[in-house]
């Protein structure tokens, strides 16, 4: 059929004739004819357009020029298929496609359709169908053409990967056999191979049947050797074919697939021997995972060393190992395995030959430098190329090789996948332009940058040539921010949102007004022109020439839904519509101007309310985090984290160099620059406690605050209690009669009534003097009145009675005493009394009580002048407590204090601070008169008439070791000391009862036994005492506490810090924006405190408090917004501390340790005592330097290597009975000594001689004893001793060797002067 012109009229007969010609042409290729019919059906059903039909027909009829030209007669004009003259000749084979090109094309498709994954997945599905031979190459191209219909560049590049079909139609008998080529199972690199279907003769030899069946495939492989390597590289990145496909690929099931793909039923005939030999060689080459080139491409003369190396390997290894070595080289040459894997495999074969391994590295390097060298060596040295054709491998060997090949492919696929992911990640072209980092790209203006060259430019389907010339595809504007996006660096708060909305409303209204004003002016100008006849009324007016689009839009907006109708009228008859529109515009202008005036007031109010709030961006997050940061868990985690960071090898070495002692290095430090703030904190806590706590809880909480917490910071103690003022008046009225009852013969056994009160009270100095003057009139009670005057300090203090009965604590006392009896390292921690000026007023070893120590204001007491060196000395305690017996009995026994071995005083010796005087015998020793002989044994004062004979009314009360021998009767300049109430004694005395009622408490046996327990002293070497730190020790307070006290101090510090910030910021000069009228900074701070008090009592809410703080301080006020929660949390913690038994013990231990003189205080002793109470808990060393400013340091102690072992002791019941019933038994004397009647006949200064006897006496108590629980045997501990050393006195001699007479005269005059003073006192009755 000759191609005619398009003007020729075609008929149905022409079409039938053409179909008959096609059918005759492909009579042996029925599938091609059927495919042509399918193309026509698709075109008729409009599934394919004209272009698609042309492409498919051209591909189908390739090599049949007459059919293509005949098909042109049925095509429209302009769509004819043009053939070049060279199309008749077989085209040269295409250049093999490189693996990198295929990967690049796939990545380009993925990037182009990153917003539409469906296209990319469909493309992969099409290729997968072709790989599994479910689609022909024509169908693949047709579907890909539809898929890329708007991307002609991709479709054109896709054709580059299509198979070369130039030789498919060499003869009419050729058929198309779809085979897997150029890695189509993963990439669009496709080709078709038509095999020559000449008759073949099948050999009759049964052993050659398999080779004959595979002959065609082997021949095909020999034809594809130029692209085989690229096929395998592309196959690496896809799923492996299943066993059936692999068998198809190797030709093991060739007949079944031949019947499936071919219509021809002709039998295969055997080719010539050369073809059979080639088939054998190709099949043998399968062992090397691919065909091996038949010719060598390297110069054998130039690479004799490499060949020699292969020969050396062959000589060393046996045949199987050598074959394996060559296989490894072949896999590496095909790039199936990497170089490290090759070295690993080869090392298993020749690793035992070090020389071969070294030579192999050189060999491998040389092969990498020369392409084709390694494949040529393998092809030359392989067995089959040498003519040694091995026998067909067994099925087991084939399965092994197949499995090995499968493993290698899986491994290679994973490596290739990782490489592709890295390439894709490095390119990052899958991101949209808005997410690209173009900071390093070329910049032409501040806003525009050039896209990278590798970034895919989307193709515009309708872009014409002029568009390509003028439109920009390579320069993009970098988006830095937009009002549509929220701020990423800072979130807008609700107050800012209100301001933004106001700004938007103002802007919209302003724009409306401006548009109306502009439209009004334009309309007025147009009407003026019409009225002045500048525009003729008989000609239509083009309204767009006089009014802008904005003016027309404004007019349309005026009439809302009828705006378009008004615009039509305006355009049709502007002369009539303009006056009406102008009137409407002026009405709207006035209405919107009036609306703006009204809204300005509303907006001004919104600005006023929200401006300061909008500036606060930190309060929102601060409120969220503050409750978490103030939790106990967070505070503990904070210091533990800091402690762990500081703990390292350097610290450990430092501790080792320091004798394995603790290193004092604070973990946290806080400054307290303003001491006046402590008063504000006190008032805040007291006020909040009144709102939150009951009266009883208020007293306990404020006692911890005023008597423990504030003194550590150097704040003087203050009166405390809920009923201070009322009780002060009551106590003044009752002081006189209470003291008279205390010294009367009927109530002489107790002075509890003298201090009896149901609540705290104050003692007035003038009232005390008046009482004393009245009491002095009674001769029998004169000494008692003197004692009350001298022992009652002239200070205003509140003394709430916090009494506990001995029976309530008998069990606790017994347990603690037992533990101390077995542990000489434990200091007597129980029975600690309140301190005055750093001295303990009274001490009892009976047990740890639940009462809290109460620090008081510093008294004006003066210590006695010491007249000894390192000897025992006696001092006047600030607050002496009267022991058992009457008042007169107490003061009569002050002259002499008996001391037993092992008992030391903290003020006289550098060992145990206090000891207790127990039992009736001890009371008798104390009651010896000063005026009588020192050894006289006067009887003690009689008991009360209705009291029991076993104990006094006050119960277990112990004296103090720190009282001076002369006590309150000394004539020296000693201020009178205040008498402490027995209700504060740590032994837990019962509340005072009236003696007339006879309700005197009776102590239990266990408590009586504990009266004999003496404190166990621990000897501290004087070398540990550091005299250089006296000043620093006096100005600092050290406290060892647990987690509870650490949290307490931290909460106190946080509250102090926030109140300080309020005070500083309120007085800051940079407050111009706050108020127009400047105010006094003190007034600003007072306003903040008033607002805080209103918040605490519920007068105002949090919102009003926050507004007040912002108005006064500004943006820095956010730290004050949670003050109420912080204060409530601190009060709750104070309640927990006041109620916790262990916390009370720690406070008592602190008071006990502070009873020592500052120069005798030892941190190590305090620390070991704290370890006794907290053996398994964290211990914190809290130190406050009372300097200017005060500084608080907190350290979490790490025991390290020196943690002492605090062992718990379980006592045998038998030994316990012996200890309490025998060793500690107490038998009171039935006979009581009468009181001394003539007190003034007793020598007052009898203690002077006794003090002189102990002058220059050194006593060291180091003797220890141990008790065996099983036998109750007491024995001394070896290498322990007591030492008493008295230095001899030397007389001072003059030059002649005689005693100095002048000294004797001076001494005599002093004695006479002293006697005269005593005589005068006797006469005056003082």
Swiss-Prot record:
Residues 272-299, 715-812, 844-864, 927-1000 are annotated as: Disordered. It is found in: Nucleus. GO terms for molecular function: transcription corepressor activity. InterPro entries: HDAC_interact_dom (IPR013194), PAH (IPR003822), PAH_sf (IPR036600), Sin3-like (IPR039774), Sin3_C (IPR031693). Gene3D superfamilies: Paired amphipathic helix. Pfam families: PAH (PF02671), Sin3_corepress (PF08295), Sin3a_C (PF16879). Residues 721-737, 967-981 have a biased composition (Basic and acidic residues). Residues 744-757, 781-805, 844-861, 942-961 have a biased composition (Polar residues). PROSITE patterns: PAH. The keyword Heme does not apply. Residues 8-78, 95-165, 292-367 form the PAH domain. Keywords: Nucleus, Repeat, Repressor, Transcription, Transcription regulation. GO terms for cellular component: nucleus. Acts as a transcriptional repressor. Plays roles in regulating gene expression and genome stability. PANTHER family: SIN3A, ISOFORM G, SIN3B-RELATED. This is Paired amphipathic helix protein Sin3-like 4. It comes from Arabidopsis thaliana (Mouse-ear cress).
């Amino acid at each position: 059929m000759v191609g005619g012109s398009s003007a020729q009229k075609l008929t149905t007969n022409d079409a039938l004739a053409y179909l008959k010609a096609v059918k005759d042409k492909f009579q042996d290729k029925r599938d091609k004819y059927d495919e042509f019919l399918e193309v026509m059906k698709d075109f008729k059903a409009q599934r394919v357009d004209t272009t698609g039909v042309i492409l498919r027909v051209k591909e189908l009829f390739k090599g049949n020029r007459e059919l293509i030209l005949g098909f042109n007669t049925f095509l429209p004009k302009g769509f004819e298929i043009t053939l070049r003259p060279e199309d008749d000749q077989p085209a040269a084979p295409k250049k093999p496609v490189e693996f990198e090109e295929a990967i690049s094309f796939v990545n380009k498709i993925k990037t182009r359709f990153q917003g539409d994954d469906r296209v990319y997945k469909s493309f992969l599905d099409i290729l997968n169908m072709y790989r599994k031979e479910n689609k022909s190459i024509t169908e693949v191209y047709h579907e890909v053409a539809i898929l890329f219909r708007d991307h002609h560049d991709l479709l054109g590049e896709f054709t580059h990967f299509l198979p070369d079909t130039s030789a498919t139609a060499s003869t009419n008998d050729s058929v198309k056999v779809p085979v897997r080529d150029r890695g189509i199972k993963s990439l669009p690199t496709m080709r078709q191979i038509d095999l020559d279907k000449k008759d073949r003769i099948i050999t009759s030899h049964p052993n050659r049947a398999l080779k004959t069946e595979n002959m065609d495939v082997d021949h095909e492989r020999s034809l594809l050797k130029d692209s085989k390597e690229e096929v395998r590289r592309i196959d690496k990145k896809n799923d492996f074919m299943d066993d059936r496909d692999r068998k198809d690929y190797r030709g093991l099931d060739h007949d079944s697939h031949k019947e499936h793909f071919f219509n021809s039923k002709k039998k295969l005939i055997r080719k010539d021997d050369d073809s059979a030999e080639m088939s054998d060689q190709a099949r043998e080459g399968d062992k090397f995972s691919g065909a091996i080139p038949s010719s060598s491409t390297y110069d054998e003369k130039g690479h004799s060393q490499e060949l020699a190396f292969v020969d050396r390997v062959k000589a060393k290894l046996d045949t199987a190992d050598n074959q394996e070595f060559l296989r490894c080289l072949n896999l590496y040459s095909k790039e199936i395995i990497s170089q490290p894997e090759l070295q690993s495999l080869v090392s298993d074969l020749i690793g035992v030959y070090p020389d071969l391994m070294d030579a192999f590295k050189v060999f491998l390097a040389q092969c990498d430098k020369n392409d084709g060298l390694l494949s040529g060596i393998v092809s030359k040295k392989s067995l089959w190329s040498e003519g040694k054709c091995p026998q067909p491998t067994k099925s087991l060997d084939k399965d092994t090789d197949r499995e090995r090949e499968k493993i290698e492919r899986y491994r290679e696929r994973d490596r290739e996948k990782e490489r592709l992911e890295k390439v894709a990640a490095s390119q990052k072209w899958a991101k949209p332009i808005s997410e690209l980092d173009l900071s390093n790209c070329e910049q032409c203006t501040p806003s525009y940058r050039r896209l990278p060259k590798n970034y895919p430019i989307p193709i515009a389907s309708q872009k014409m040539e002029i568009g390509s010339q003028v439109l920009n595809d390579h320069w993009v504007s970098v988006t830095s921010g937009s009002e549509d996006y929220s701020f990423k660096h800072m979130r807008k708060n609700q107050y800012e949102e209100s301001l933004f909305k106001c700004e938007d409303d103002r802007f919209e209204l302003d724009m409306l007004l401006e548009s109306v004003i502009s439209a009004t002016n334009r309309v007025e100008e147009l009407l003026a022109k019409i009225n002045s006849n500048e525009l003729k009324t008989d000609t239509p007016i083009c309204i767009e020439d006089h009014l802008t689009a904005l003016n027309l839009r404004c007019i349309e907006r005026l009439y809302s839904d009828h705006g378009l109708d008004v615009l039509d009228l305006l355009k049709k008859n502007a002369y009539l519509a303009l006056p009406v529109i102008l009137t409407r515009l002026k009405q709207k202008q006035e209405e919107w101007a009036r609306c703006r005036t009204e809204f300005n007031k509303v907006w001004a109010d919104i600005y006023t309310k929200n401006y300061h709030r909008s500036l606060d961006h930190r309060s929102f997050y601060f409120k969220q985090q503050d409750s978490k940061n103030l939790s106990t868990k967070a505070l503990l985690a904070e210091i533990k984290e800091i402690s762990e960071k500081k703990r390292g090898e350097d610290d450990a070495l430092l501790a080792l160099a320091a004798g394995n002692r603790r290193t004092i290095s604070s973990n946290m430090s806080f400054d307290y620059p303003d001491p006046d703030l402590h008063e504000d904190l006190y008032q805040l806590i007291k006020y909040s406690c009144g709102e939150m706590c009951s009266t009883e809880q208020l007293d306990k909480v404020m006692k911890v605050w005023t008597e423990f917490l504030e003194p550590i910071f150097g704040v003087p103690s203050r009166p405390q209690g809920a009923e201070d003022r009322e009780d002060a008046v009551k106590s003044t009225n009752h002081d006189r009669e209470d003291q008279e009852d205390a010294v009367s013969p009927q109530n002489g056994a107790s002075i509890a009534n003298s201090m009896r009160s149901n609540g705290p009270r104050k003692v007035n100095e003038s009232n005390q003097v008046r009482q004393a003057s009245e009491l002095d009139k009674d001769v029998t009670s004169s000494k008692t009145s003197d004692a009350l005057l001298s022992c009652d300090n002239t200070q205003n203090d509140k003394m709430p009675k916090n009494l506990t009965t001995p029976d309530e604590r008998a069990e606790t006392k017994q347990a603690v005493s037992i533990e101390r009896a077995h542990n000489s390292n434990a200091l007597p921690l129980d029975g600690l009394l309140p301190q005055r000026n750093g001295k303990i007023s009274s001490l009892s070893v009976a047990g740890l009580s639940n009462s809290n120590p109460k620090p008081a204001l510093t008294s004006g007491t003066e210590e006695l002048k010491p007249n000894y060196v390192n000897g025992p000395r006696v001092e006047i305690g600030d607050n002496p407590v009267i022991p058992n017996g009457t008042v007169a009995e107490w003061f009569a026994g002050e002259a002499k204090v008996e001391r037993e071995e092992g008992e030391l005083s903290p003020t006289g010796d550098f060992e145990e601070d206090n000891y207790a005087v127990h039992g009736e015998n001890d009371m008798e020793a104390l009651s010896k008169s000063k005026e009588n002989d020192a050894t006289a044994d006067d009887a003690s004062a009689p008991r009360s008439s209705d009291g029991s004979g076993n104990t006094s009314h006050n119960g277990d009360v112990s004296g103090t070791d720190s009282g001076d021998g002369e006590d309150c009767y000394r004539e020296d300049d000693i201020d009178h000391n205040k008498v402490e109430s027995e209700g504060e004694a740590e032994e837990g005395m019962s509340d005072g009862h009236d003696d007339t009622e006879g309700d005197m408490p009776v102590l239990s046996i266990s408590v009586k036994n504990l009266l004999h327990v003496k404190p166990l002293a621990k000897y501290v070497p004087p070398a540990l005492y550091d005299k250089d730190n006296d000043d620093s020790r006096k100005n600092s307070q050290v406290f060892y506490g647990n987690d509870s006290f650490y949290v307490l101090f931290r909460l106190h510090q946080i509250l102090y810090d926030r109140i300080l910030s309020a005070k500083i910021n309120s007085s800051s000069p940079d407050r111009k924006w706050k108020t127009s009228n400047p105010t006094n900074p003190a007034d600003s701070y007072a306003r903040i405190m008033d607002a805080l008090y209103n918040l605490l009592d519920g007068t105002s809410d949090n919102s009003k408090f926050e507004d007040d703080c912002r108005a006064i301080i500004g943006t820095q006020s956010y730290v004050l917004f949670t003050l109420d929660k912080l204060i409530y949390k601190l009060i709750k913690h104070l309640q927990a501390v006041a109620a916790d038994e262990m916390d009370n013990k720690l406070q008592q231990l602190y008071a006990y340790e502070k009873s020592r003189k500052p120069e005798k205080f030892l941190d190590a002793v305090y620390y070991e005592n704290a370890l006794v109470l907290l053996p398994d808990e964290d211990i914190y060393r809290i130190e406050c330097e009372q300097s200017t400013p005060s500084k608080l340091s907190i350290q979490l102690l790490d025991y390290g290597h020196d943690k002492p072992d605090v062992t718990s002791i379980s006592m045998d019941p038998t030994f316990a009975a012996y200890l309490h019933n025998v060793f500690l038994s107490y038998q009171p004397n039935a006979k009581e000594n009468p009181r001394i009647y003539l007190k003034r006949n007793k020598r007052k200064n009898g203690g002077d001689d006794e003090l002189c006897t102990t002058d220059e006496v050194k006593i060291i108590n180091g003797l220890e004893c141990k008790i065996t629980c099983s036998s109750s045997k007491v024995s001394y501990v070896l290498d322990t001793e007591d030492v008493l050393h008295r230095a001899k006195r030397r007389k001072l001699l003059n030059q002649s060797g005689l005693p100095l007479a002048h000294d004797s005269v001076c001494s005599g005059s002093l004695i006479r002067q002293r006697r005269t003073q005593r005589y005068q006192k006797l006469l005056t009755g003082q």
